[in-house]
Amino acid sequence: WNSFSRVVVYRRQYLPPQLWGGSPVARGENIFFHGMTIDGAAGTAIRSFASPKDIEHLRYDITNVGYYLNRRGKACIIGVGGGKDIQSALFFGHDAVLGIEVNPIFVDLLQNEFREFAGLANRDDVTFVVDDARSFLSQSREQFSVIQMALIDTWAATGAGAFSLSENALYTVEAWQTFLSRLSEGGIFTVSRWYSAEHIGETGRVLSLGVESLLRLKVKKPADHMALITIGNVSTLLICQQPLSEADINRLRQVCEALQYQIVHVPNGLPTEPILRQILSAQSSDQLAEAVAHAELDYSPPTDDNPYFFNMLKLNHLDTALRGQEGVLSGNLRALATLLVLLIVLGVLTVATIGVPLWLAHRPTTLMQTRGFWFGALYFSLIGSAFMFVEIALIQRLNVFTGHPIYSLGILLFTLIASTGMGSFISDH
């Protein structure tokens, strides 16, 4: 346990490896690993790593397709988890690997209890940093040949769909501009997300996010700087500051043919899916906005002012969600319904536990007193609501500077409460 998560590690198992997007040609050899769950739902594993043969199966995971482009130098992993992505970078021959993890429990497990089993902390070419990835990379001037962000989120609240209403500062245009600026010449930023050919959902928004980020970096034709590869329900997007070369494109085609991945997009090969084609054809922010304006889902690129990457439901398309479509729409609809129910419950509880006792204590006898009581209650309720709205927005922004939500919460609460107290004291005098 720590202040914001619960991580459970299970006993060692000897089973076929867990791959996010496994190739059909992957060998079925068993490996030793410890399964892990975070907050009771999100899953990962700590793999045994004593020799390259122990992690050879990682070559068959689509989240690692970017490594086949033979970039060397230092790799950066956003979200260490059980160490799988660090092991992947080492397997594909990177000189050094930096792993950035916001949850200290993972780093502690890899550096102590599972130090020998995972085989990472005892290597000179592996460095761990406990920090928010965006905050760290904003302050660092280090350059990387590959930056990998594979399925970084938590499933803790997806049962009710509530996670679609959570903020995520890693999936905004400003964050991706930071990540892209930390790439060395020819470097690759690789992002893996969930995908479905019928309901493209997150993949469409990731593409939109990549296009807008490149446009803000003065790239004239973003489609030439991106490739999208899929297998099953996982997609991997590759983004470069420089256009992908003909050698890169040929290499991707060879790898995808050998591993039976599907190529959705490479330069000079736009997708057949209309919305993806329109997004990748955009050569300005206005064209991108026009391309996604009439889609049933919200594919607009999230920004720091609207960092809700996972909330893709448009209120003017509620009828589409109500028709019972699966995937993103149904999850977003559950989230909206859950939010409305919670607001109603909280409203009733607030009136029952605060409003009614105050009413009974004062018992206004005239219409004027009754109006004054309820207007006063409404006035102070609005002040409290405004206080919370400001707090939520500032915590999100402060995370980038402090590197951790716990620090942001502590600093912000102290500052707001102290300032409010001083303001009340001064106004009374």
Name every feature range the model reports, one short phrase each.
Residues 1-124, 306-409:
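Class I S-adenosylmethionine
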Residues 105-106, 113, 123-124, 129-131, ...:
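Mobile active-site "lid"/loop adjacent to the S-adenosyl-L-methionine
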Residues 192, 215-232, 265:
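Conserved S-adenosyl-L-methionine
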Residues 204-218:
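Short alpha-helix
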Residues 222, 234-290:
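Flexible, glycine-/basic-rich loop-and-beta segments that form/coincide
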Residues 263-337:
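Periplasmic/ER-lumenal interhelical loops and adjacent helix-loop junctions
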Residues 345-356, 412-429:
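Transmembrane alpha-helices of Major Facilitator/SLC transporters
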